[in-house]
């Protein structure tokens, strides 16, 4: 664990003491080396699955893929931000990259924590850098409104969790993930325990987010700069799913009784957000709503508590993280050239930037879960396990898949095909930086299907 944490910490002096000319190059190079070093986590070899450097930080097959995804994303965020942050004053550029690095530190500590209270503290700590990135570097003035939504939704959702954790500490005397799975704190079906169950899961349902408490997400995504959108879509939403999986072990007998409304809400959300996507005019908003739909499927897979559901949820979280981050990067390349997020004002791009269209096509297909990609594997495992749980869910998940395919193709056709508007005839060509950025997103998706056991948790 420290072989990643210490180099990440050493990124701060790199950022603040590098000369202006080399700031971006050194930051990207060092963070890419850290990302490559983090791949060594995937080779875990212990009987329990846990491999711990000490009592407080450990990795297991559930957290490892998410840790590697976090490390992989930092160089990509810095790479994506270079164009629109580099004209700013030097100290502001340094502050921006430092915020991204601190976010990575908090996320590594959150996914690596073995004490639930430490996980909670890091879960909350990720709020601060994200909030600063949205409210300081967002594009429009609505960013303050978006930041407020983001802050209050997340805080209001996670305060009951803090109370629940303190009660649990008082009751069982420990909050360590190693021991809590052997103590069953909630074997009585009393009203107090039911409220406690809801408090434990509410924070994660808001963070995922499940349909109904999702209003902060489109606002935050639309107003955030590119790095904010990428980290939010790729890793911060996954904190919710990861937290739910960790807490599910303890909440056992109650979940079977109380999870029904949340499963229905999650599945209904897939159809509702898909329908909302079909009538979006704003590019980033469409991608943000599609994230809510995919996370609804993940929530359903986790709440039915079957090994296949858990496995499908982990795979879909990783695959969706890379695919939606790639889509946000592509939306940003379009926005930097046309200065508009409205799809009608930036269409027919295939005429001018044909190679970008190829990237758009691959990313859209990854989003709609085309066969060779892990997105399909995750979705199929969740849909199959839900079908075994109740046959009626097939109506909702099947319709959701159909709508997902529809809006993904609608997104591709609206941005890339059709007549070219007269005001965007002369656009600057694509840079190697942008091609590298999208390649580093899409290559892991394509390669992961060759060795999916890296990310399917304990079920092997």
From Swiss-Prot:
Membrane-topology descriptor: Multi-pass membrane protein
Transmembrane segments: 20-42, 61-81, 94-113, 117-139, 148-168, 195-215, 225-245, 258-278, 285-304, 308-330, 351-371, 394-414, 436-456
Biological-process GO terms, alphabetical: ATP synthesis coupled electron transport; electron transport coupled proton transport
EC number(s) per entry: 7.1.1.2
GO molecular function: NADH dehydrogenase (ubiquinone) activity; ubiquinone binding
Main location: mitochondrion
Subcellular location: Mitochondrion membrane
Catalytic activity: a ubiquinone + NADH + 5 H(+)(in) = a ubiquinol + NAD(+) + 4 H(+)(out)
One GO cellular component term: mitochondrial membrane
InterPro entries the UniProt entry points to: NADH4_N, NADH_Q_OxRdtase_chainM/4, NADH_UbQ_OxRdtase, ND/Mrp_TM
Domain of life: Eukaryota
Keywords: Electron transport, Membrane, Mitochondrion, NAD, Respiratory chain, Translocase, Transmembrane, Transmembrane helix, Transport, Ubiquinone
Purpose: Core subunit of the mitochondrial membrane respiratory chain NADH dehydrogenase (Complex I) that is believed to belong to the minimal assembly required for catalysis. Complex I functions in the transfer of electrons from NADH to the respiratory chain. The immediate electron acceptor for the enzyme is believed to be ubiquinone.
Family of this protein: Belongs to the complex I subunit 4 family.
Protein name: NADH-ubiquinone oxidoreductase chain 4
Species the sequence originates in: Salmo salar (Atlantic salmon)
């Amino acid at each position: 664990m420290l072989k990643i944490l210490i180099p990440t910490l050493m990124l701060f002096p790199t950022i603040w003491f590098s000369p202006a000319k080399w700031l971006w190059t050194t930051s990207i190079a060092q963070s890419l080396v850290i990302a490559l070093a983090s791949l060594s986590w995937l080779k875990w070899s212990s009987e329990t699955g846990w491999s711990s450097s000490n009592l407080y930080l450990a990795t297991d097959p559930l957290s490892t893929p998410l840790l590697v995804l976090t490390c992989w994303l930092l160089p990509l965020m810095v790479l994506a931000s270079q164009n629109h942050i580099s004209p700013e004053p030097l100290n502001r550029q340094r502050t921006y990259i430092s915020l991204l690095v601190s976010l990575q530190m908090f996320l590594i500590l959150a996914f690596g924590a073995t004490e639930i209270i430490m996980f909670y503290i890091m879960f909350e700590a990720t709020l601060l850098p994200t909030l600063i990135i949205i409210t300081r570097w967002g594009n429009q003035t609505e960013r303050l409104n978006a930041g407020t939504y983001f802050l209050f939704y997340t805080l209001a959702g996670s305060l009951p969790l803090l109370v629940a954790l303190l009660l649990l500490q008082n009751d069982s005397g420990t909050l360590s993930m190693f021991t809590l799975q052997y103590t069953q704190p909630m074997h009585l079906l009393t009203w107090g325990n039911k409220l406690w169950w809801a408090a434990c899961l509410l924070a994660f349902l808001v963070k995922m987010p499940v349909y109904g408490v999702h209003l902060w997400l489109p606002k935050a995504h639309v107003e955030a700069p590119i790095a904010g959108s990428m980290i939010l879509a790729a890793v911060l939403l996954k904190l919710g799913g990861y937290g739910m999986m960790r807490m599910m072990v303890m909440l056992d007998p109650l979940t079977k009784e109380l999870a029904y409304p949340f499963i229905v809400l999650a599945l209904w959300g897939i159809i509702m957000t898909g329908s909302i996507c079909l009538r979006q005019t704003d590019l980033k908003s469409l991608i943000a709503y599609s994230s809510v739909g995919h996370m609804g499927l993940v929530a359903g897979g986790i709440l039915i508590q079957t090994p296949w559901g858990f496995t499908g949820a982990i795979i879909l979280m990783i695959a969706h993280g890379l695919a939606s981050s790639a889509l946000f990067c592509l939306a940003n390349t379009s926005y930097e050239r046309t200065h508009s997020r409205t799809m009608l004002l930036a269409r027919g791009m295939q005429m001018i930037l044909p190679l970008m269209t190829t990237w758009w096509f691959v990313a859209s297909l990854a989003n709609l879960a085309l066969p060779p990609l892990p997105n399909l594997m995750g979705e199929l495992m969740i849909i199959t396990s839900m079908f075994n749980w109740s046959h009626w869910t097939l109506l909702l998940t099947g319709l959701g898949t159909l709508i997902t395919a529809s809006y993904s193709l609608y997104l591709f056709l609206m941005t890339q095909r059709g007549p070219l508007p007269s005001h965007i005839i002369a656009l600057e060509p694509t840079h190697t930086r942008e091609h590298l950025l999208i390649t580093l997103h899409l290559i892991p998706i394509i390669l992961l299907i060759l060795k999916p056991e890296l990310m399917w948790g304990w079920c092997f």
